[in-house]
UniProtKB/Swiss-Prot annotation:
It holds the Pfam family ATP-synt_DE. It comes from Vibrio parahaemolyticus serotype O3:K6 (strain RIMD 2210633). One of its GO terms (cellular component) is plasma membrane. SUPFAM superfamilies: Epsilon subunit of F1F0-ATP synthase C-terminal domain, Epsilon subunit of F1F0-ATP synthase N-terminal domain. GO terms for molecular function: ATP binding; proton-transporting ATP synthase activity, rotational mechanism. This is ATP synthase epsilon chain. The gene is atpC.
Amino acid sequence: MAPITFHLDVVSAEKRIFSGRVETFQVTGSEGELGIFHGHTPLLSAIKPGMVRIVKQHGHEEFIYVSGGMVEVQPGTATVLADTAIRGEDLDAAKAEEAKRRAEEKIQNQHGDMDFAQAASELAKAIAQLRVIELTKKRR
């Protein structure tokens, strides 16, 4: 028996990144990891920088980096509305490594709470991008 699917849209301010039927998807919500399957209770949550792991029909996976945003789950459909969303294969590993290095430098040379919070946020985003790149490469 085939798994039950539901519709998922992943959109950013610039464009729709993904639209289709999925078996499940995972995203990092404000309170931790969320695994969404068909029939999930309706939900609205903020999402943190990280990845959206999508399991499409027949078990095919796709990874998308999101810089934060919201996830909404309704009966039969879900939407990830991201500030920024980039497919794993479109991320630049060299740029992500450089962003990680710069953020680590800022943390080492901090001059107040605001500098630290900004640098920690930049570091989290760079690490999330590198993780999506790594998982996308493994999938191939």
